[in-house]
Amino acid sequence: MAWFDGPVHIPRALTSVGRTKTPFHRWVYAPARFRRLIGLYPPLLGAGVRVSHISDDWTAGTVTVRVHPWTANLHGSAFGGALFSATDVLYGMMLAAQLGRRFEVWTKAASIEFHAPGTGTLTLQV
């Protein structure tokens, strides 16, 4: 959560996209609705990713990743792509909701450091 501490610098080119949001975009900015809707998104559903909690002010969230045979690597631990997809969806939406509807958030670059193999059900708290 280090990059949420303190002010967030947003380059001028990323500030406003000038698009009118659809009613769907306005509807999805409620944390409970987003949590239920993202649970039905096929890539995350197949990867075993589930958003289990998002705070009302979008400052905290919990994601679980269940390791299935189709999401495990040759050693039986969680495939790194499934772990990264769990973090990307939550961080991106939390930042977008905090910045407001006039902004779009895109993951331009990211890195992940694995400390130990993940097996069973993994929990990410942001």
Region roles according to the model:
Residues M1-T62:
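Non-catalytic linker/capping segments at the edges of enzyme domains
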Residues G39, G46, P69, N73, ...:
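Residue-level signal for pocket-adjacent positions within structured domains
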Residues L40, G46-A47, G76, S85, ...:
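Generic structural "secondary-structure junction" signal
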Residues R50, A60-T64, S111, T123-Q125:
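Beta-strand secondary-structure signal
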Residues I54, A78, A116-G118:
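Hydrophobic beta-strand core residues of beta-sandwich domains
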Residues D56, W70-A72, T119:
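Generic "edge-of-domain/loop-turn" microfeature
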Residues R66-Y91:
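Hot-dog-fold acyl-thioester-processing enzymes
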Residues M93-Q125:
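Hydrophobic beta-strand-centered segment that forms part of the acyl-chain substrate-binding groove
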